[in-house]
Amino acid sequence: MSPEAYVLFFNSFNLVTFEAFASVSLIIATVAFLLSPGGLAWAWTGSSKSRVSIPGPSGSLSVFSGSNPHRVLAALAKRFKASPLMAFSVGFSRFVISSEPETAKEILSSSAFADRPVKESAYELLFHRAMGFAPYGEYWRNLRRISSTHLFSPRRIASFEGVRVGIGMKMVKKIKSLVTSDACGEVEVKKIVHFGSLNNVMTTVFGESYDFDEVNGKGCFLERLVSEGYELLGIFNWSDHFWFLRWFDFQGVRKRCRALVSEVNTFVGGIIEKHKMKKGNNLNGEENDFVDVLLGLQKDEKLSDSDMIAVLWEMIFRGTDTVAILVEWVLARMVLHQDIQDKLYREIASATSNNIRSLSDSDIPKLPYLQAIVKETLRLHPPGPLLSWARLAIHDVHVGPNLVPAGTIAMVNMWSITHNAKIWTDPEAFMPERFISEDVSIMGSDLRLAPFGSGRRVCPGKAMGLATVHLWIGQLIQNFEWVKGSCDVELAEVLKLSMEMKNPLKCKAVPRNVGFA
C-alpha cells in the first residue's frame, strides 16, 4: 500500500471510529440523562446535588393525562420510599410532591413557594389576575385583603343566610317534583345541586338568580360557560410542559379559551355596567352583592373593570363546582350507609323540635354529627387532591435536607395523606365518629386534613363554602330519605379540575313528613 493510500485509509478509519464513538457516547449520555433520578426535567438542573438527593422515577411521566394521577403518584412515592418528598418530571416541567403532613406544611407555609404555576388555560381565562393564580406581590396582597375584609368576612357570610336557605328549599321543591314525575322516583343529584350552587354564587356575587326550569335561559347559558371553562382548565395540555409546542396550539386550548373569554367579558361586563347604573341611583350606598362591594372600594383597593371581571369570573368557578361535588359525595355515602343517615336525621330532627321548622345556620353548631360527616367525606374524597395544591418555587430553597431549585412546581398529595394508615385508623372505612372523638380542624392548620389549602394560598371562601354545604346537606336529609335506586352507587372517581364521581349519583329521594311547607 502506498503511503498516500495508507494515510487515506487511516484517516477514514479514524473518522468512522470517531463517529461510532460519538454515536455510542450520545446514546449513553441520553440514556443516563433520561434515567436521572426525577427524570428528564431534573437532569437539566445545574446542580448535580439537587438532581440526586430527592428520590423519584426516571424518564418523563404523563401521569396527569390519566384519570387518577393522585393514586399513581401515591403508589410511586411508596415504591421509591419517597413519601416526604419525591421528584418527577412531566416533559420539561420539574416537580416535587409530598405525601406527608410535616413536609407538606413546610412547603405550603414557606414564602419560597408563594407563587402558583399558571397553566396556559388559566392565563388565557384571565385567572392570572384573580386571587388563585395572581403572582405573589402587591396586587395579590390587595386581593387577599379585599377577600378577607369585604367579601368573606363573618358578617358578609351571615348576611347571605337567607340566600342559602332559599336556594336550598328551591332544590327541595325541584327534587319533590322530579321524584313525583319519575316512575322510579329517582333523581340525578348533581344536575340539581350544580344548578343550585351556580344560583347561589350568582345571587351572592351578582345579585341575580335563575329559574331551575327555564330552558335556554341565562342560567343555562352561564352553566355552559362554566362547564366549558372547567373542561379547559382540567385538560392536560402538552404545551404546558413542552415549551416548543406553545407555538402550535395542537389541542386547540388557546383558541377555545379566547372564544370563551370573549363571551365572559360580554356577560360579566354587562352585569358590572348594570351595577354601575344602579349605584348611581342608589343614594344609600347599600351593598347587596359582591359586585356592589367591589365597586364601592376606595382609592388603593379599587380594581379596574378588567381585573374585576377576572376576580368575579374566578368566584363563579371556585364557588360552584366544589360545593356541588362535595354535596354529591356526601349523599352517595348516605345512600351506602343508611345507619349513618338515620343517625344524622335524628340529630337534625332533635335540633328543629322534631322537624316543626326548617333548618337554619344557627342550628349547625348544634349538629356535630353533620359536621363530622362532611369532614369524613372530605377525608375520603378530597375535592382537590393534587392540582389545586400546586405551588411554584420562586428561588432555590431547602425542603428538609433536599435542595429544590427555583422554578420547581411543588405539590401535596392530600389524597395520599388522608388514606395513610399511619395517620388514620382504618383509613378506607367511612367513620364520621373519628371526628367526634377528635376535633380535627379542616381550615388549614392541621395538614392531616386540609381540603381548602394552607398558608398564604389557602382558599379565601372556605368558611362560606362550608356554611353552604352544611346547610344544604341538613336540608336535603331533613326533607328526604336517600336510598339506592335502580343502579348501584359506585364510588369510582375521576380527577378533572376537582375529584368527581366517575358515574354521577342517581338514587331515590323519598320525601319525609315534616311540619313545615
Swiss-Prot record:
Query: Which Gene3D superfamilies did the record assign?
Result: Cytochrome P450
The prosthetic group or cofactor this protein requires is: heme
Q: What happens when the gene is disrupted?
A: Reduced size of leaves, sepals, petals and seeds. Increased leaf number.
Bilayer-crossing regions: 20-40
Localization per Swiss-Prot or TrEMBL: Membrane
Keywords from UniProt, A to Z, are: Developmental protein, Growth regulation, Heme, Iron, Membrane, Metal-binding, Monooxygenase, Oxidoreductase, Transmembrane, Transmembrane helix
Recall the taxonomic lineage recorded for the source organism: Eukaryota, Viridiplantae, Streptophyta, Embryophyta, Tracheophyta
CDD domains cross-referenced by the UniProt entry:
CYP78
What broad class describes the main subcellular location of this protein? membrane
Record protein name field: Cytochrome P450 78A5
**Family annotation (Pfam families):** p450
Q: Which tissues show it?
A: Expressed in the periphery of the shoot apical meristem and inflorescence meristem, on the adaxial sides of developing floral organs and in developing ovules in the region where the integuments emerge.
Which EC number(s) does UniProt give?
Answer: 1.14.-.-
Which membrane topology describes this protein?
A: Single-pass membrane protein
Per the record, the similarity remark reads: Belongs to the cytochrome P450 family.
Highest taxon above the source species: Eukaryota
Q: Name one GO biological process term.
A: floral organ development
UniProt function note: Plays a role in regulating directional growth at the meristem/organ boundary. Is required for the promotion of leaf and floral organ growth and for the prolongation of the plastochron. Promotes organ growth in a non-cell-autonomous manner and may generate a mobile growth signal distinct from the classical phytohormones that prevents premature arrest of proliferation, until the correct primordium size has been reached. Functions probably in association with CYP78A7 in regulating relative growth of the shoot apical meristem and plant organs.
Q: What else is known?
A: Plants over-expressing CYP78A5 have twisted and kinked stems, defects in floral organogenesis and reduced fertility.
Q: Which amino acid positions bind heme, per UniProt? A: C459
Q: Which GO terms describe its cellular component?
A: endoplasmic reticulum; membrane
* Molecular function (Gene Ontology), one example: oxidoreductase activity, acting on paired donors, with incorporation or reduction of molecular oxygen
